[in-house]
Amino acid sequence: MSRLLWKKVAGAKVASGPVPATGRWVSSSVLDPVPSDGQPQSQMPSSENGQLRLNPLHIQMLSRGLHEQIFGCGGDVPDEAAVQRSIEHLRKHGLWGQPTTPLPDVQLRLPRLFGGNLDQHFRLLAQKQSLPYLEAAASLSEAQLPPQPRKWVWAEGWTRYGPEGEAEPVAIPEERALVFDVEVCLAEGTCPTLAVAISPSAWYSWCSRRLVEERYSWTSQLSPADLIPLGVSASASSSTQQDWQEQLVVGHNVSFDRAHIREQYLIQGSRMRFLDTMSMHMAISGLSSFQRSLWMGAKQGKHKTQHPTKRGQKSQKNANGPAISSWDWMDISSANNLADVHNLYVGGPRLAKEPRELFVKGSMRDIRENFQDLMEYCARDVWATFEVFQQQLPLFLERCPHPVTLAGMLEMGVSYLPVNQNWERYLTEAQSTYEELQREMKKSLMELANDACQLLSGERYKEDPWLWDLEWDLQEFKQKKAKKVKKTASASKLPIEGAGPFGDPMDQEDPGPPSEEEELQQNIMAHTRLQQLKSTTDLLPKRPQHLPGHPGWYRKLCPRLDDPAWTPGPSLLSLQMRVTPKLMALTWDGFPLHYSDSHGWGYLVPGRRDNLTELPVSPTEESAAVTCPYRAIESLYRRHCLDQGKQQLETQETDLAEEFLLTDSAMWQTVEELGCLDVEAEATVESSGLSQPLVPPTACAPKTSQPTYHHGNGPYNDVDIPGCWFFKLPHKDGNNYNVGSPFAKDFLPKMEDGTLQAGPGGARGPRALEINKMISFWRNAHKRISSQMVVWLPRSALPRAVTRHPSFDEESHYGAILPQVVTAGTITRRAVEPTWLTASNARPDRVGSELKAMVQAPPGYVLVGADVDSQELWIAAVLGDAHFAGMHGCTAFGWMTLQGRKSRGTDLHSKTAATVGISREHAKVFNYGRIYGAGQSFAERLLMQFNHRLSRQEAADKAQQMYAVTKGLRRYRLSDDGEWLVKQLNVPVDRTEDGWVSLQDLRKIRREASRKSRWKKWEVVTERAWTGGTESEMFNKLESIAMSDTPRTPVLGCCISRALEPSVVQGEFMTSRVNWVVQSSAVDYLHLMLVAMKWLFEEFAIDGRFCISIHDEVRYLVREEDRYRAALALQITNLLTRCMFAYKLGLNDLPQSVAFFSAVDIDQCLRKEVTMDCKTPSNPTGMERKYGIPQGEALDIYQIIELTKGSLEKRSQPGP
């Protein structure tokens, strides 16, 4: 049945009855667990020299025992010519003959494998795991569904509707497959309000108790009773996963619906799995981020023009981006929302989404009053999702034919994060710390504003480098005319006379302690003056003035007296105001910040003289008010140079700051975001012969008016500041963008390295800047974090392993968060989730950054996981190795990935850093950026972002040097027309040994051809390739896949999105396509791991479940007693997954250095390293002292084998 179904739906070819190698493989016909022979698995016999294996390039491979168990006896003999070619290549790049240290061999008896090879093994495992769900999906997609009910029942719980619309209450929909949709009244919290489901046999509706029963208020804490029951009714405390029925739930963005299902919060998990039509759409016809912006722009302009080409021409004319010549992809793709996806796959009238606004903005009363209409809306969405699913399923199985893809996505869809009462404590502590720091910052800013206001005395503000251009106009004190002129005049002089001007000697004299008579006289005089003052109240205007005598900018910061939220002082001041950077006296490399309406935030560089002559000889009051104190700015910069140890106003070579702390998902997200900005313009370069960097914006000043001692983004001389040039602050997306706030998170690294700092005088400015940095994480993320849906489990819902554990506390709370992971949220099929998959690691200067550590295992359980070491780098390297000479490590890139050592400077990042003269951390970003398809212009932008002191030309030179050494030089093979032109025109051409010609020769040929035959366009190139670099072969392989007729991942054969296929995009979007090859292969890697782990957990009765995968790391929730066996399972999984990659690429071997995880983490919480105490401003004492969580264990393969005796069998497991 399984093979027939897969052949029918997926077109998978499964060989029947392969002959297994003796003692190594189990026949593919055996899908049930292999019976034990009653003996524990023993380790491989050890021999001192018989196990060590080296390939011809002196790279240590798997031990003989492991190699024979996985790949069989013997092996491919490498071609001698290929070996010599590899040696010469490595010698050219200074890597041949480098000393290496062999690793101890791993002696391990693996579980017996299915099928005749690794591919069949994984195929059969995945078929077994996904078959029940595939059968359910097939039956659902082929079913004739019953008609929709005409009227929906107003009743708590589930209602089933028969074929004739008859309604009956049911406990749960006992169906194998459902299309499901949940709606939530957001005004009432996250509790589900109503739901609709459909199966092949019936419609179902569900209403919450909060909808049916009217109460004044409901508790905000959610329990399982508030959620939707959808699984088999069983006692949660005694059930295991095997007690649940296998069910499939289909939905659009189904992770949202899953978060409202009761059984999904149980620790043991269930056998319900989820298929997301949004994820399937991304895999079939998803859009890259750049395509999505084009698609949205075209959609918004549809009423203006209907022809895509015209839209494209318009975009080319108006946009700063690349010229898009092919628009066919727009007809076979869409955005991700259900309405657009339904329109793409099904067509017909557009879905009406207006009723959804009632759930977003309305109250529960509104929903009750519109119950039938809203149920109808929800049912329409369910029906639309079913229609989309019918069209998608065969397309998905055709384009992702390997069963591992489906099985991996099903497993990815059941992420689970356990939490306890520490979660609420974390939220409280982080918010209170944030508010306390915010109050301190507010106080510092208000004091800065009060101090700045004092500069009005003596017009000292005119010499201030920051405050000179603020509104210093004063509002005069107004009063009514007095009836009795003489008395009023004499009386009105008294308070003024007594007040005296600021700094008057009368106020500063100290005559000593007064006598009793003097005190009495003073009291009488004070009483008299008070009475006189009271008598003048009638002179006040009817509407009181707002702070007369204070400058205009200060008055705007103070609330009016009639404001209900009035507080004294400049309490309206915040970081979002433009005056704040000026009050804090912010400087950029010693230059004062300045705001321009046309260019945003920048800074003033003194020394300009060409605009000083334009100053009026006798300036008016207005012009004097805006005269820049350029001499004060010069003095400010001189002091900065002295403080920094600079003797002259000249640029000094400085080390790059380590501002990019790139860890876990931040690495690839940062690079991918920047890489998307890069546009491949190779065709233009080839035809035009222009390879110069981009011309600076026209707004920049001519060379005759720019500073010699400073260069940056500018100068922009349309900002005419006498005596100064205006330079823009660098924007992360390029110089054409304006900076809206210097307090944005992109400038935090510049605050840390001292480039952006508060000015001289006092500690208030620097402290406010420091606090801004500390609260930045919580300010940006607290809404997402605080709105996480936490469901607390009653004791009856906890398994015995928890309640009987010694550390179980009756007073504590235990619950879970279900991260709403979109299993394929990008065109690379990467998972997407806004909070957990983007969470950074704990930092001592970031409030709330200990977020991940709040995921804590319940008593009796631990979190077991590991990071895949250099996942994308190894995938790209092994692709290049297989392409070049068919040996591991035969390219310089592959050798550095496998054998490179940071201590010797031979690893990839150290080599790149040494080549360009940058830090190793920055080199990581460039290396990943190239692999993701980013070109040289990306490197130029990134170099200037890392080091803003670089000129554009310096950045271009460094980038060119980096790409010449790594990616190599572009070479071309001439077509028949090209060869004919060379002969006919007698064009001298230098060729390599392989017949390649350079870009310069190609331009020469084209120039001569266009001169002799003006109107004919010659196709002179038949093939392009990179040569001479450490990564040339790898890029040639990536580009050959990306430019093939139907790009597929090399291991699992998944197709690229239809919107990026060469037939519809021609030569466009190459960055996205090359990026897809590596990242989509990394998703294949993850899916293989998930399938292998599920097999080993079931085969050897390891009590655990999948928790989450964050980019290249996986975490499992495991019973404490099974923790070491789970760690061994992870190591075996990594070994088999890497071997699967090698096998599919024709490399029947694997280097020892990448076979196993460097360490498997066993911990009670989720953190990057088991030794991290996660100290932050909101957790100053650390995890152990505050939350009672000790350090975990990090075990390598040798330690794990020692603890488990190399066996996954339970009886061999040592006690804790």
From Swiss-Prot:
Keyword Ribonucleoprotein: no
Residue spans of biased composition, Polar residues class: 38-50
Keywords: DNA replication, DNA-binding, DNA-directed DNA polymerase, Hydrolase, Lyase, Magnesium, Metal-binding, Mitochondrion, Mitochondrion nucleoid, Nucleotidyltransferase, Transferase
Active site: residue positions: 181 (exonuclease activity)
Ranges of Acidic residues composition bias in the record: 506-518
Motif annotated as Pol A, chain positions: 864-873
Record motif Exo III, residues: 377-385
Residues reported in the UniProt entry to bind a 2'-deoxyribonucleoside 5'-triphosphate: 867-868, 870, 872, 920, 924, 928, 1112
Positions of RNA binding: 560, 731, 740, 745, 840, 846
UniProt: Mg(2+) 2 binding residues: 867-868, 1112
Motif (Pol C) on chain: 1111-1118
Compositional bias of kind Basic residues: 301-314
Domain of life: Eukaryota
Biological-process GO terms, alphabetical: base-excision repair; base-excision repair, gap-filling; cellular response to glucose stimulus; determination of adult lifespan; DNA replication proofreading; DNA-templated DNA replication; mitochondrial DNA replication; response to gamma radiation
Coiled-coil portions: none
Gene3D superfamilies: 1.20.5.3960, 3.30.420.390, 3.30.70.370, 5' to 3' exonuclease, C-terminal subdomain
Positions that bind DNA: 289, 574, 783, 826, 1071-1072
Task of the protein: Catalytic subunit of DNA polymerase gamma solely responsible for replication of mitochondrial DNA (mtDNA). Replicates both heavy and light strands of the circular mtDNA genome using a single-stranded DNA template, RNA primers and the four deoxyribonucleoside triphosphates as substrates. Has 5' -> 3' polymerase activity.
Family designation: Belongs to the DNA polymerase type-A family.
Description of how the protein assembles with itself and partners: Heterotrimer composed of a catalytic subunit and a homodimer of accessory subunits (POLG:POLG2). Interacts with TTC3. Interacts with LIG3.
UniProt protein name: DNA polymerase subunit gamma-1
Gene name per UniProt: Polg
